[in-house]
């Protein structure tokens, strides 16, 4: 598809994703406050993820990122809503990368908690105060690694300036160079003889990114598998326990699939395609498309799977529907009475 068509799709996903993320996470925060008493410390982790998801959606809507892969180079381009300096634009792009990395890391922490709760309950004390404060500190390390690499190892050069200008002029005619900031992941360059060589500085940064992403995925997969394995061992439990285990299993499967489909797989393509000189061009924007939708999907799964949350939401809408029907019937009866008196 053309770059202009992808811009339309990405901007639509931005509106839909932001609206869904804001509404679903506000509902989840309300449910956590009023129906989350039995979740223990996990509700604080869920609340943090909900607040972060809303914040992340706001950052995405402000920076309006697009992605492009061409000539063994991956471009992360942010469309400016305001006029600011090139350096501030670079900082903003690195900050977006930090938020992007945080979504990976926090998802991994979710699975660690679920693993502790199912397999190592004695370790759950690590999610209580004061140990709870160590988790944000630990999570900040890979996040800062990702952001620092994005800022320091991918400088703007004459080559990247010419390359991003060519990309905009060729694929995104409605975007002017002065209205964007960018980070260019250059995998290969050419010497004065036209011989291609690996650009080690940028490749090192890509390795750091890929390591952080792979580490969180491995944690998520191992914790998910061990949790699933533990659940299967409790088949002889009571009907009520089996029902609860079934709910948790569904949540576990969906919470594994959603990040894999909307985060890990697209980001894996983002790093691998340039290495093999696969020119996705504007089609790389499917990564942005997925990232806009993900923050609203994960909490929606929790609302639909956790019975107390689901029943509360359904009762709310059913009650509103019932009240609407009753009001309509009352209005109809009143009108009929007026007609009868005349």
From Swiss-Prot:
Describe its membrane topology: Multi-pass membrane protein
Segments spanning the bilayer are 12-32, 39-59, 93-113, 132-152, 203-223, 258-278, 286-306
Extracellular compartment: which residues?
Answer: 1-11, 60-92, 153-202, 279-285
Chain ranges on the Cytoplasmic side, renumbered to this chain = 33-38, 114-131, 224-257, 307-342
- Compartment(s) of residence: Cell projection, Cilium membrane
| Pfam families xrefs | 7TM_GPCR_Str
Q: Which domain of life is it from?
A: Eukaryota
InterPro entries per UniProt:
7TM_GPCR_serpentine_rcpt_Str
Q: Which residues are glycosylated?
A: 71, 83, 179
Q: Which GO BP terms, alphabetically?
A: G protein-coupled receptor signaling pathway; olfactory behavior; positive chemotaxis
Q: Got a GO cellular component term for this one?
A: periciliary membrane compartment
Gene Ontology terms, MF aspect: G protein-coupled olfactory receptor activity; G-protein alpha-subunit binding
The protein's UniProt keywords, in alphabetical order, are:
Cell membrane, Cell projection, Chemotaxis, Cilium, Glycoprotein, Membrane, Olfaction, Receptor, Sensory transduction, Transmembrane, Transmembrane helix
> What does the record give as the function of this protein?
An odorant receptor which affects chemotaxis to the volatile odorant diacetyl. Specifies AWA neuronal cell fate via the odr-7 pathway.
- Assembly behavior: Interacts with odr-4.
Q: Which family does it belong to?
A: Belongs to the nematode receptor-like protein str family.
Which protein, by its recorded name, is this?
A: Serpentine receptor class r-10
Per the UniProt entry, what species is this protein from, by scientific name?
Caenorhabditis briggsae
The beginning of the lineage is: Eukaryota, Metazoa, Ecdysozoa, Nematoda, Chromadorea
């Amino acid at each position: 598809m053309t770059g202009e068509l992808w811009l339309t799709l990405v901007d639509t996903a931005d509106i839909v994703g932001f609206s869904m993320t804001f509404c679903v996470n506000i509902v989840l925060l309300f449910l956590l406050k009023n129906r989350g008493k039995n979740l223990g410390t996990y509700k604080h982790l869920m609340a943090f993820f909900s607040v972060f998801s809303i914040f992340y959606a706001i950052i995405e809507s402000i920076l309006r990122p697009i992605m492009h892969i061409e000539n063994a180079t991956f471009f992360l381009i942010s469309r400016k809503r305001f006029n600011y300096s090139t350096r501030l634009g670079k900082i903003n792009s690195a900050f977006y990368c930090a938020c992007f990395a945080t979504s990976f890391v926090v998802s991994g922490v979710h699975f660690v908690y679920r693993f502790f709760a199912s397999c190592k309950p004695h370790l759950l004390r690590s999610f209580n105060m004061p140990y709870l404060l160590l988790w944000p500190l630990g999570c900040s390390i890979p996040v800062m690694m990702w952001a620092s690499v994005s800022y320091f190892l991918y400088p703007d050069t004459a080559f990247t300036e010419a390359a991003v200008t060519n990309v905009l002029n060729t694929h995104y005619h409605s975007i002017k160079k002065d209205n964007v900031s960018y980070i260019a992941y250059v995998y290969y360059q050419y010497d004065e003889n036209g011989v291609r060589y690996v650009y080690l500085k940028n490749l090192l940064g890509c390795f750091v990114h890929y390591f952080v992403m792979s580490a969180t995925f491995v944690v998520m997969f191992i914790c998910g598998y061990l949790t699933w394995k533990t659940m299967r061992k409790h088949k002889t439990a009571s009907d009520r326990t089996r029902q609860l285990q079934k709910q948790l299993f569904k949540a576990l499967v969906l919470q594994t699939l959603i990040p894999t489909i909307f985060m890990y797989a697209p980001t894996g393509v983002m790093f691998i395609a340039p290495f093999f000189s696969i020119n996705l061009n504007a089609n790389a924007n499917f990564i942005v498309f997925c990232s806009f939708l993900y923050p609203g999907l994960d909490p929606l799964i929790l609302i639909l799977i956790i019975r107390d949350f689901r029943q509360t939401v359904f009762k709310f809408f059913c009650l509103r529907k019932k009240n609407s029907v009753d009001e309509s019937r009352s209005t109809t009866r009143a009108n009929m009475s007026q007609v009868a008196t005349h």
